[in-house]
Amino acid sequence: MIVTKVIEVIGSSETGSDDAVREALAAAQRSIRGITSVEVCQVTCTVEDGGISRWEALVKIYFPVEPR
């Protein structure tokens, strides 16, 4: 049986939602091995002067838990 752990991470970018998701994944990869999937749960934007100034992506990161 494989046990999978799920964490939530928020990534942000000034250039787009794809980059915000990639930033969240990169942040998780700094401390987690074996990430198997990413689920994008929510994308939000900050608007300044009539345009989008920042994108944020809330993602779920899935990875297996190794047996002890």
Language-model-derived ranges and their functions:
Residues 1-2, 68:
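Compositionally biased, disordered extreme N-termini, encompassing classical targeting presequences
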Residues 2-36:
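Short, well-ordered alpha-helical segments
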